[in-house]
């Protein structure tokens, strides 16, 4: 039971880290003054993609783990290190490009692009044999809720909080990568 609770805590922290990426992007999208119905669909779509992408990643990760064993374990840890580092670096860059309007194909493209990193984390978790259902439900729930929160507070705090939330998420993934490689 203690191991299960520990796994839920670790997976929740990873879900928080991945959700912070969606949160930081949603902060900027909150400036578009979207309707509540649009915000609901945006959060729901991002949550769904944060279920599907790590699910696909976990399937590939389990296959790699069976085929390559301990080499895949180190690759999974290195992947988390790389992804965390990329998130931290991205948090310090300024991207003034025009945002996609979050409707129709634009929303699907947006949700896909925000959830790409959850595929990579799912790949690592698949290598380590994490519980699939718990993982995808936590990832989907955290990203959906954090997207909604980001959309709501985006008008007020985007300039201050945006890069810090992505840096925090990257730091969490970086820490897990170090843990997997060295502990």
Curated annotation (Swiss-Prot):
InterPro entries: Mntp/YtaF, Put_MntP. Keywords: Cell membrane, Ion transport, Manganese, Membrane, Transmembrane, Transmembrane helix, Transport. The chain crosses the membrane at residues 8-28, 40-60, 72-92, 108-128, 133-153, 163-183. Signal peptide: none annotated. This is Putative manganese efflux pump MntP. Its main location: membrane. Probably functions as a manganese efflux pump. One of its GO terms (molecular function) is manganese ion transmembrane transporter activity. PANTHER family: MANGANESE EFFLUX PUMP MNTP-RELATED. The lineage of its organism: Bacteria, Bacillati, Bacillota, Bacilli, Bacillales. Belongs to the MntP (TC 9.B.29) family. It comes from Geobacillus kaustophilus (strain HTA426). It is found in: Cell membrane. GO terms for cellular component: plasma membrane.
